[in-house]
A protein has these predicted regions:
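Membrane-interface segments at loop-to-transmembrane junctions
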Residues: 38-46, 207-218
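Transmembrane alpha-helical segments in integral membrane proteins
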Residues: 17-32, 103-118, 182-200, 239
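A generic transmembrane alpha-helix motif of multi-pass inner-membrane proteins
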Residues: 158, 162-187, 209-240
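Loop-to-transmembrane helix boundary motifs in multi-pass membrane proteins
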Residues: 46-52, 91-94, 103-106, 120-156, ...
């Protein structure tokens, strides 16, 4: 049970872009007339509904054709195409699936890139064009090991037999950066050594909409950091 709960919460870190500042960047574009609590609830609900709909489609299809639904990237590029081949109109379903996968990948790239671009503009005063050009070169170079890990660098198995460079990068991001980044954000918002609870409440409740309640202060300050830390430790226990 704990493994499933930990995996689900880890997935939430990824899909909601927690711990890497993407939500903060998009939140900065919302004017002061709208409170952040209602916006955050709407995003979380919509994300959950999309995940449930995807699960209702993918899992029955995998079980019907006797394939493993937990095969990671192979599920997208090997397993599901084989499932589509067994369905009437396989070319249409396959084409639509990868088309929508491209849209999903593009939206993710935009979210992550916007965070990096805004960081470069605010910290170093770069123009948007300069920030895009330089970051595109750097990210392309950093992406090469992942791409080459499936062919000419396939002999590199950093996490054991059968693993790839992508598995290592996924472990670094999903099991380290996302939970630890979320923990830093959380402690910054509630700790007197950071922004502080009062400043957080003032900012969260500015404007119109759903107010952020005061009653979960103890939970957010003391219990929630322990939950995030547990997810981080659980990821290492399952991996090693």
């Amino acid at each position: 049970v704990m493994t499933v709960v930990s995996a689900a919460m880890g997935q939430a870190f990824f899909t909601l872009s927690l711990g890497i500042g993407a939500i903060a960047i998009f939140g900065s574009y919302i004017d002061k007339s709208r409170r952040l609590t209602g916006e955050a609830i709407s995003v979380a609900i919509l994300d959950t509904l999309v995940a449930l709909m995807a699960g209702l489609v993918i899992f029955p299809a995998c079980f019907a054709f006797g394939v493993n639904p937990g095969s990671g990237p192979n599920l997208v590029f090997i397993t599901l195409p084989n499932v589509f081949n067994e369905m009437p109109g396989s070319r249409i379903w396959g084409a639509m699936f990868f088309l929508f996968m491209s849209f999903a990948a593009l939206s993710t790239i935009i979210a992550v890139f916007q965070n990096i671009l805004s960081f470069a503009q605010d910290l170093w005063g770069w123009s948007l064009k300069k920030s895009i050009a330089l970051n595109a070169v750097v990210i392309t170079l950093l992406s090469l090991p992942c791409a080459l890990g499936f062919n000419v660098w396939s002999f590199i198995q950093p996490l054991g037999v059968g693993t790839t460079i992508q598995d290592l990068e996924d472990f670094i991001v999903s099991n380290n950066i996302l939970p630890l980044g979320s923990l830093v954000y959380l402690l910054f918002c509630v700790s007197r050594y950071g922004w502080g609870w009062d400043n957080f409440m003032k900012e969260a409740n500015e404007g119109k909409g759903i107010k952020f309640p005061k009653w979960p202060k103890i939970y957010i300050t003391y219990i929630l950091p322990l939950i995030v830390l547990f997810i981080f430790v659980q990821g290492y226990i399952e991996k090693f």
